[in-house]
Amino acid sequence: MASSVLNLFKSCRPFTPIRFSSLPKSQFRIQFPLRPGKETQLRRCFTTLSSLTDGGAPISGGKELWLHNTMSRKKELFKPKVEGKVGMYVCGVTAYDLSHIGHARVYVTFDVLLRYLKHLGYEVSYVRNFTDVDDKIIARAKELEEDPISLSRRFCEEFNRDMEQLQCLDPSVQPRVSDHIPQIIDLIKQILDNGYAYKVDGDIYFSVDKFPTYGKLSGRKLEDNRAGERVAVDTRKKHPADFALWKAAKEGEPFWESPWGRGRPGWHIECSAMSAAYLGYSFDIHGGGMDLVFPHHENEIAQSCAACDSSNISYWIHNGFVTVDSEKMSKSLGNFFTIRQVIDLYHPLALRLFLMGTHYRSPINYSDFLLESASERIFYIYQTLHDCESALGEKDSTFENGSVPSDTLTSINTFRTEFVASMSDDLLTPVTLAAMSEPLKTINDLIHTRKGKKQARREESLKALETTIRDVLTILGLMPTSYSEVLEQLKEKALKRAGLKEEDVLQRVQERTDARKNKEYERSDAIRKDLAKVGIALMDSPEGTTWRPAIPLALQEPVTTTP
């Protein structure tokens, strides 16, 4: 099974002393509704599982990781510049409003990469900045009659709350532009001294025609490029694509003193300065959304190389867009949903699963159906693990390798192999999530085993399977603090989406029970269907009727159109 999956998806120093120590090509799209963290947890993951193969030998895979490099336009074997250490910079948000789920996709993507690198044993210096000096921030501050820096700091805090909800690990450092003006000025000085920039009336522009390889990341030719700014083309520029490194102060805008007079940094120079400050000019991974390839990352490369000719980033990694009706979700288009809006109705871990259900480089279309599918799937996962926990009771979760039945070991090893194969192949999270179905099914089968040989060694199997899945969930950032708590939260969200309270559901359950006793089967079926339409599924058992969240029948029914 693992082989079929593989076949199918087959030296300058920084200018400021605050740095950290530091498969073959294929393209495809995966998107489908799936059915059924802590640092110490990440270090612990798979320490037990590595000995679960015949003879105690760990499953092959090691530290091999293939990542798609935007620069080379192909998958490459990951090799860090310094053995055992990884430097990673991801462009952060421009903080002037609540973040939308397009932002969530970026940072969940790189959180998965961060977690997997840690799982592989790397020491990761992860830098994710905040842009708190920008035209959009200034405009929003004027609109709200608020100080721009104060407004931005407020939304930086809101962003961090969103990331905590999505179980994204904290970066090693989160630098803000306003705290790094001296470093930015130093970098601009270096670029000017090296002859790659020019001054115009207090502004400093980068001269793109002085940089022969400009466009190598995006594949654009210089003559085809538009200005690399967020404002209209300035006729004072030598070339239309020249972009601002420093902007002269305007009345009512924040400014800082510089050798060129009062002003503020341009957009692109900020990330070049902060990445060099913490990671140096040469590091491993630079990431962000696909929309940053041009002009932002293209301009970063030009600036950094102009300041230091040995500047080099090994891997440029970009995630695909979240779309709404095939258009990119963005604040500027006004077609966005904030993270807060989504997690008001759906559990944050359901949103995380939704984002991981499509390969990170492919576009993902926002829809209620896919979010409902993710919510149903995550409920199934946690319910299965909760039932497993209940079946084991207070028993010690540790187990001896030799006590686990061979068929369980086979199931675990198959899943482990699929996990390594899919994650090492450019982070194929959809394949990993799909592969989880088999061990979950095995747990459910074992829980309902009451006699025979399986019952005799049931506990050892359940312990081993639960440990396996728990460790994978931890690496994926999907492990909750408590199965029971998150199940209750998922039910609360489902009730909110349905516009019901639990007592309403329980009353309908009782009405249905009475109808069945009276052999009013049509009424009984109608009650079940009414609840199913709004995402409440009823489950009958000898102990009575219970309910769980499900994809609303109204979303599952095909839409009919009249000619």
From Swiss-Prot:
Location of this chain's protein in the cell: Plastid, Chloroplast; Mitochondrion
TM regions (residue ranges): none
Motif ('KIIK' region): 136-139
Keywords: Aminoacyl-tRNA synthetase, ATP-binding, Chloroplast, Ligase, Metal-binding, Mitochondrion, Nucleotide-binding, Plastid, Protein biosynthesis, Transit peptide, Zinc
InterPro entries found in the cross-reference section: Cys-tRNA-ligase, Cys-tRNA/MSH_ligase, CysS_C, Rossmann-like_a/b/a_fold, tRNA-synt_1_cat_dom, tRNAsynth_Ia_anticodon-bd
Amino-acid positions noted as binding L-cysteine in the UniProt annotation, renumbered to this chain: G92, T131, H296
Pfam families: CysS_C, tRNA-synt_1e
GO biological process terms, semicolon-separated: cristae formation; cysteinyl-tRNA aminoacylation; polar nucleus fusion; regulation of programmed cell death
UniProt motif ('HIGH' region) ranges: 93-103
Gene Ontology MF terms: ATP binding; cysteine-tRNA ligase activity; metal ion binding
Top EC class of this enzyme: ligase
Motif ('KMSKS' region): 328-332
Changes seen on gene knockout: Embryonic lethality when homozygous.
Main location per the UniProt record: plastid
Cofactor note: Binds 1 zinc ion per subunit.
SUPFAM superfamilies (UniProt xref): Anticodon-binding domain of a subclass of class I aminoacyl-tRNA synthetases (SSF47323), Nucleotidylyl transferase (SSF52374)
Binding residue positions for Zn(2+): C91, C271, H296, E300
UniProt-listed NCBIfam families: cysS
Function: Required for female gametophyte development. Is necessary for the fusion of central cell nuclei and programmed cell death (PCD) of the antipodals.
Protein name, per record: Cysteine--tRNA ligase, chloroplastic/mitochondrial
Gene of this entry: SYCO
